[in-house]
Amino acid sequence: VLSAVPAVGLAAYVYSTDITSREPLSLLVATFLLGVLTANFAAVLNSVLRPYFGVLGVVGTVLFFFVVVGPVEESVKLLAVRLYAYTDDRFDAVLDGTVYGAMAGLGFAVIENALYITRELPATELDVGLGLIGAGGGITAIRALAGPGHVIYSAIAGYYLGLAKFNPGRRGPIVVEGVLIAAFGHPTSNATGGIGSGVIGDVNRRSGLARFM
């Protein structure tokens, strides 16, 4: 839950800055849930393709983020908006795309954080008491760095989707431009999260050593 707080706060901020009409709760909730569903599809696709890049070492990891993770995750989050909210008459302004994009990103981030923490928290830590708190806290902090990125870049792509809705003559190029911008920024966010992961992991190891001493 704590790992999602920054993403929730950012999504709430995007919602509050909508200077047009307030978006209906039904569309916001539906978009959030679709963001959760599309996250599962992205997770499967990422898992299938990752081994092909793993053989290339660090270069493969970078390529994987830019060629697969960014485009796939930003596309499915935009799909979460396109499937329902976009088709509703209440999606009646360009900035609505930003709000719904942020909600799709929030849904994606929440389920991704939950899956990541469940997978990464070692089963052996369950018997260690304070060790569990330390490990869980470290992972939570790492995921807290990643969550806002999903909201930000999904909101950017959503803005372009809003532009596309009201510029039917250039709809395709506008949507592609938005996805490309978000897909390029996303791996940069992942790299930042990776640096944070290393720092937090090092702090946790040092703390454990200090307790032992």
Q: Can you say where each PLM-predicted feature lies in the sequence?
A:
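Hydrophobic alpha-helical segments at protein termini of multi-pass membrane proteins
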Residues: 1-213
